[in-house]
């Protein structure tokens, strides 16, 4: 079938298998050009492994360090001529490329928040890897059913204590708009922490440790975004910020647990990139469009693979890791360059409907958004029929 992009709001409801595969190959090629990751991990579990930063971590570990990988994700398979999700096709392509290079790859498809998927993952580690020496936590979901209580918690993107008016882009109409966000209630804050805080990461590490599948010296990291002044009202100072603070508290306990066996636990702070999640946040398309414009002009623009490959080489396995005062690994230094942030702030209120394409890189933002779903990738013929029914080998469901 011939597959074209169909966008509804902040979701593209179609995905292109060949485009997703080409995107994965591009990321692999980037890692390969940088050469081997010295003293890198050899057996890696990635929780949230099918898109964005989690996929980039799996690619960097496998094709940079030669690691065997086990990826956990929750994706929809193609069925009845309906394409699967982008994460499904990304993972299928990863398996194909890993197999071609003799790299062990196993994947588990299901709800990473559940006890069932944790148990299936542990069984797969025992069977295929024995133990893991790196656990990357990159799960991103709007809701979580708690495995012990059965309660489903829904995360909320709201300020705390007062309403906040945010500038942004109505991406459907390509117009500047303002959104008034009301403050979160105590229950909404608690629910957001339950979904996006550190509890599930801790549950994973506790389960892996109790099962004896964490190697001595094992490391774990959870990915997060903090941002700077322009995004603080809804990130660090909002409901999501409370979840991020919970992550910072959780990592201290995990670090103590792993340090006893020569290991480590860190929160890794990454730069803002286009994801399905970020595109749904009222101010982020405008912020990203301005950030792209400024960073591309300076030659410092990076995407997921550049960020995570650098994180592994420079900090997780580097001799001189970039660590902040709270003990987090920082890969967002170029975004937070004072000159970059000052220029973004300077332009923020100047953007109008008329100059959207000149003052910002909204065109680049839209292109990155479509790339998430396999569209706009160099070398792919989008007028040619493509087979949507792609399977993932070694898949556990």
UniProtKB/Swiss-Prot annotation:
Entry EC number(s): 1.3.1.9
The record's InterPro entries line, in alphabetical order, gives:
Eno_Rdtase_FAD-bd_dom, Enoyl-CoA_Rdtase_cat_dom, FabV-like_NADH_b, NAD(P)-bd_dom_sf, Trans-2-enoyl-CoA_reductase
> This protein's superkingdom?
Bacteria
Record-listed NAD(+) binding positions: 48-53, 74-75, 111-112, 139-140, 244, 273-275
The UniProt keyword set, sorted, is: Fatty acid biosynthesis, Fatty acid metabolism, Lipid biosynthesis, Lipid metabolism, NAD, Oxidoreductase
Active-site positions on this chain? 235
Site annotation Plays an important role in discriminating NADH against NADPH: residues: 75
Which leading EC class covers this enzyme?
oxidoreductase
Lipid metabolism listed as a keyword: yes
Reaction equations catalysed:
a 2,3-saturated acyl-[ACP] + NAD(+) = a (2E)-enoyl-[ACP] + NADH + H(+)
List residues binding substrate: 225
Q: Tell whether Oxidoreductase is among the UniProt keywords.
A: yes
Give the coiled coil ranges.
none
What biological process terms from GO does the record include? fatty acid biosynthetic process
Q: Check the UniProt entry and state the signal peptide residues, or none.
A: none
Q: What pathway is it annotated to?
A: Lipid metabolism; fatty acid biosynthesis
Single Gene Ontology MF annotation: trans-2-enoyl-CoA reductase (NADH) activity
Q: Which PANTHER family match?
A: ENOYL-[ACYL-CARRIER-PROTEIN] REDUCTASE [NADH]
Which family, according to the similarity comment? Belongs to the TER reductase family.
The free-text function statement in the UniProt record for this protein reads:
Involved in the final reduction of the elongation cycle of fatty acid synthesis (FAS II). Catalyzes the reduction of a carbon-carbon double bond in an enoyl moiety that is covalently linked to an acyl carrier protein (ACP).
Self-association or partners: how does it assemble?
A: Monomer.
Q: What is this protein called?
A: Enoyl-[acyl-carrier-protein] reductase [NADH]
């Amino acid at each position: 079938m011939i597959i074209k992009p169909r966008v509804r709001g902040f979701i593209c409801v179609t995905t292109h298998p060949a485009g997703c595969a080409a995107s994965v190959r591009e990321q692999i090629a980037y890692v390969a050009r940088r050469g081997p990751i010295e003293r890198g991990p050899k057996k890696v579990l990635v929780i949230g492994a099918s898109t964005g930063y989690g996929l980039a971590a799996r690619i960097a570990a496998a094709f940079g360090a030669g690691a065997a990988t086990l990826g956990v994700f929750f994706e929809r398979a193609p069925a009845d001529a309906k394409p699967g999700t982008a994460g499904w096709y990304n993972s299928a392509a990863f398996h194909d490329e890993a197999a071609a290079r003799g790299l062990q790859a196993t994947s588990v498809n299901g709800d990473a928040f559940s006890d069932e998927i944790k148990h299936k993952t542990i069984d797969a580690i025992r069977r295929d890897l024995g133990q893991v020496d790196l656990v990357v936590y990159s799960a991103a979901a709007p809701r979580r059913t708690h495995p012990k209580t059965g309660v489903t918690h829904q995360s909320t993107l709201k300020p705390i204590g007062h309403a906040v008016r945010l500038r942004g882009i109505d991406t459907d109409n390509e117009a500047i708009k303002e959104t008034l966000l009301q403050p979160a209630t105590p229950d909404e804050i608690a629910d957001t922490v339950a979904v996006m805080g550190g509890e599930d990461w801790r549950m994973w590490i506790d389960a892996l440790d109790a099962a004896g599948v964490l190697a001595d010296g094992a490391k774990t990291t959870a990915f997060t975004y903090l941002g700077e002044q322009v995004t603080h009202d809804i990130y660090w100072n909002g409901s999501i910020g409370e979840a991020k603070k919970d992550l910072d508290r959780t990592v201290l306990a995990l670090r103590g647990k792993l340090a006893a066996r020569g290991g480590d636990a860190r929160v890794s702070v990454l730069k803002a990139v286009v994801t399905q999640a970020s595109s749904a946040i009222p101010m982020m398309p405008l912020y990203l469009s301005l950030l792209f414009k400024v960073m591309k002009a300076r030659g410092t623009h990076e995407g997921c693979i550049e960020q995570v490959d650098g994180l592994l080489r420079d900090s997780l396995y580097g001799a001189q890791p970039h660590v902040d005062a709270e003990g987090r690994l920082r890969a967002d230094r170029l975004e937070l360059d004072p000159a970059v942030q000052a220029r973004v702030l300077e332009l923020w209120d100047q953007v109008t409907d008329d100059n959207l394409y000149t003052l910002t890189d909204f065109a680049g933002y839209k292109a990155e958004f479509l790339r998430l779903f396999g569209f706009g990738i160099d070398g792919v013929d989008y007028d040619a029929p493509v087979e949507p029914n792609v399977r993932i080998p070694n898949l556990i469901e």
